[in-house]
Amino acid sequence: MFRKFVQQDPDGYPLTELGSTRREFLMRGACLAGAAALGGAYLPQAMAAGPLTLKATHGTGLCNCPFFLVKERNLAQGVTLDFVTTPSNADIAALFGAGVVDVSVVPYTNFMTLYDAGAPIKIVAGSGAQGCVIVAQPGITSAAQLRGKTIGTFQADTLEMLPYDYLKKAGMSFADVKVRYFGTSPELAQAFIAGNVDAMCHIEPYATQALKARPGSVQLSNGVDVYGANYSDCVLAVRSKLLHENRDAVKALIKAMMVAQHQEELDRASAVKDTVGKYFKTSYDATLDAASKQPAMIDQRSNQNFILQRAQNLKDLRYIKRLPGPEMFDWGPLNEVIKENSDLYGQLKLKSA
């Protein structure tokens, strides 16, 4: 459905092509806003009649680990996840915005571009915290030394926000550097390891992989120095149709994510073993090393203002036209899950309360 919609315009942007400019990115977003009117993949179904299958997209970083564990360990009662494979990072959000999938773990920045374009979607929980990392080639040890250099990242991503804010903190801007956009996480990591970019902002475990593979490379920022601890990266978002028609399914998924967070906190090695290779295209050792650097945090109600503040960056970069408000969040199902599962919630290490 989505591919057919995109290909109606011979000059449009097919799923396999990643736009390299903001103009192309925004044209893709406009296309998706129209596709959203076609409806979602979710079909109403009584959970008592059998497991409800939700089509989903996900990212490639450790912020997605609880989402992966929900699927691999069958943690959601009455709900199963059907992951839809995407050819590029941009298409992870694209399919969600177009209504091809019901739910997604997505960078909050990508969510805001879809929301601004009119997609009927809501943030209902968090997924991962921290884990955005700026790494540089040997000899580059400060923001000032990035002047005139090439930084690799992804469009309208949290991985574009960090270098934007990192440079701003140093009195610089994107005008002082060359920004190069990539299509997939492995592609960006390999470009850095091969020395084809001077620096990159990447997600864990790919940042750790690159630092290990490129002798002498330097971590310039892990985001904590810019934003503080436990800043948001990815969020759990759902189509409004699903939220309205099967709230219990959304709650079951949120609870399962909390169970996954607890399991990950108790045994990171086991969580990595169940997800590396299939989801993380890095070595077991690099992934385990990185696991604690981007922990799961499902209750991110405390990050609402942080997320909204980043919207100004997206507007300045012309990804969105209007600043969103708190209405793009619906914490109701999360609040109910917490109230109904106080023992589980009390065992979580990272949370808002």
Model regions and ranges:
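Short, solvent-exposed loop/beta-turn-alpha elements that line the ligand-binding surface or hinge
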Residues: 77-78, 224-229, 296-302
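Short, glycine-/small- and polar/acidic-enriched structural segments
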Residues: 49-191, 198-204, 219-221, 229-230
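Cleavable N-terminal signal peptides
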Residues: 35, 46-47
